Amino acid sequence: MIATSAEARNVDFYYRRFVLDRWFDREKDIICADGTMPSKPHPAIYKKAMERLGGEPAQCRVYEDLTTGIASAYAAGAGEIIAVASAALPEKLEQLPGVTYAISDFTDERIRKS
């Protein structure tokens, strides 16, 4: 599941460019900014994704690279928040409420262990 604040046209561009249909159904698995929900840090987009997945929020793992997204996931009750440190230092992101740990890339071994 992808929950993004990006607009549909941007999502569609990346969906095609990176051939994401290998892993995600565009209509079922991707929730994007469509004007019906407040933007992050409001938890609405993550709550919608969690409802769509059908599990409890505490069972959800979120990968997020922005502080507003981390705040959104935390407010939605995500059980595990993995901060992806693209521009910020991992140590700074790990100090944010709800962050389990921060990674610099998806080869981090902690992802496989949890």
Question: What spans do the regions from the language model cover?
Answer:
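Asp-based, Mg2+/Mn2+-dependent phosphohydrolase catalytic module
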Residues: 8, 12-114
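Conserved phosphate-coupling serine/threonine residues in phosphotransfer and NTP-handling enzymes
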Residues: 4-6
